[in-house]
């Protein structure tokens, strides 16, 4: 082709051009095709470098249905074998005694008082001699955790041994609880925890005096504490990890001590005296002996000075049967009122105080409940206190983020939630708060008189 022809084609108009000019849409389509081509090549190159990218890993395992009996049995057996293997990996009593002997043999002088110490070099020597089961405890991380202010860079042998004992106990307990985890997903339902505690009762000497007819009420009393505090969303299940992390299991297993003091038993919710006290109160309130509590019967709880407005809210919000409360619902009520400083208890009471269901308390809510306190004061021949004064005191105590609203988190953060709720629901509690200075003065006078005698 000569240069004349080339020039003619170059100068040709669109209508006479042998190649049509591409439209904007065609250019976009071509660009997308090129992008897809090059992106696919690049992505394909990545796939070739790592076989893992070719498949999506499985992250969901369906639980066997009720009619899939064989699959259920297979799952149960495999879990049982797995838990048995984990149990065999733990230190037994003989191995723990051997560990103590090795630690005592390799202690590093000088002693601090009567406390034996060990340095890092001897610590590693014991780890080598103690066997493979102990390997996880003899790490630099564990040593550093227990290292405090010793000038020789040593740790306490007793503290380390207690650490090992605690770890072994936690693993043993986790395995024990997992045996009752029917679903095998790391949590216990209410019925699972009931079975665990029921089978635990014979191993607790402090519960030997309980009659078997009371076992069901005891189990209900014990289980409610776990679920009230560890299941705030009321899902009906608790993580095994949460059970191990809280102190409730320690309190329950404390009942293994045959010489547990009377004071410890009185303050332990799981003790026989405590369970009998709570159930006895329930029976005393149940005047018509129908096994349930009406609003009138519940009004006699404690000092019998709770307001009718608050009790109305209890029966509106809590689960009742024909307008009456059963023992399980009563336990939640008792746990909330006896532990008002705890977030779970404050959440329970806050829900009752939040009459508009807005997630916060405003002046209207406070006035609604305090009016009932003022009415009770009149009935008892006392001069009613001004609501404005009480309202200002409450907001000063709580110091909410919003100056016109008090949220549940505000109550928890203020550490005054127990005082605020008591002022609003219980005349005796309000009177105690109002006369707190006089009561403190009387206590001081009484203590002075005792000192003089």
Curated annotation (Swiss-Prot):
Stretches assigned to the EF-hand domain: 273-308, 341-376
GO BP annotation list: B cell homeostasis; cortical cytoskeleton organization; microtubule cytoskeleton organization; positive regulation of B cell differentiation; regulation of dephosphorylation; T cell homeostasis
Positions with a binding annotation for Ca(2+): 286, 288, 290, 292, 297
Keyword terms, alphabetized: Calcium, Cytoplasm, Metal-binding, Nucleus, Repeat
GO cellular component: centrosome; cytoplasm; nucleus
InterPro entries: EF-hand-dom_pair, EF-hand_13, EF_Hand_1_Ca_BS, PPP2R3C
Main location as per UniProt: nucleus
GO molecular function, one term: metal ion binding
Compartment annotation: Nucleus; Cytoplasm
Physiological role: May regulate MCM3AP phosphorylation through phosphatase recruitment. May act as a negative regulator of ABCB1 expression and function through the dephosphorylation of ABCB1 by TFPI2/PPP2R3C complex. May play a role in the activation-induced cell death of B-cells.
Subunit structure: Interacts with MCM3AP/GANP, PPP5C, and the phosphatase 2A core enzyme composed of the PPP2CA catalytic subunit and the constant regulatory subunit PPP2R1A. Finds in a complex with ABCB1, TFPI2 and PPP2R3C; leading to the dephosphorylation of ABCB1.
Protein name, UniProt field: Serine/threonine-protein phosphatase 2A regulatory subunit B'' subunit gamma
Name of the gene: PPP2R3C
